[in-house]
Amino acid sequence: LAPVVLNKSIPELVKAAKENGVAVLAIINSHHMAAMWPETEKIAEEGLVAFACTSYKPAVAPAGAIKPLFGTNPISFAWPRKNNTPVVYDMATASMAMGEVQVAKREGHKVPLGTGLTKDGKDTTDPAEIADGGVLLPFGGYKGSGIAMMVELLAGALVGDNFSYETAAKDNNDGGPPSGGEFILAISPDKLS
């Protein structure tokens, strides 16, 4: 139900940031958020700087490990520009989004070395070995691991939701999506400068 929550709460977040300079929105116990750029872009179109992140069930091994601990933990950032579209980016903190790995698997394409490991912890370019029991790796090695951990802390601990590994433990495997948290920050450049 993330879209319903976002549609109702983003206008309140924007209002609070414009009044106070900074505002945070915490979403808990929500299903997959999909791409986050639409919400950060919407906030930036209101003249605010926006940052959003979410954690999800584990699919990424920290640098040097072979077991998943982090979600793909996407982040999105948007910067407002007067009389122009905002600067926006949205990316996974994993080397590749799991959706891209699944597309490569379905279409029979290889993925770059460094994308993930087999279930035995071996490097692979075969997306099936990653998607079917293997793990993704963070982008940028230990630096990406640090950013993924930041997302776990912001979108899990800070908002009062689960870490990715806890989300997997609580998933009842009924075919429905597990739930997680999202952290959204809005900053008013006008109030702060």
Regions found by a protein language model. Give the residues of each.
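Secondary-shell segments that build the walls of catalytic and ion/ligand-binding clefts
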Residues: 106-165, 170
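Phosphate/diphosphate-binding glycine-rich loops and adjacent basic-rich segments that engage nucleotide
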Residues: 60-128
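Metal- and O2-centered redox machinery and metal/ROS homeostasis
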Residues: 3, 11, 38-39, 135, ...
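Short glycine-rich or small-residue beta-strand-to-loop segments that form or flank ligand, phosphate
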Residues: 23-28, 138, 184-189
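Catalytic-core signal marking the mid-to-C-terminal active-site face
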Residues: 165-193
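A glycine-rich, acidic short-motif signal
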Residues: 1-87
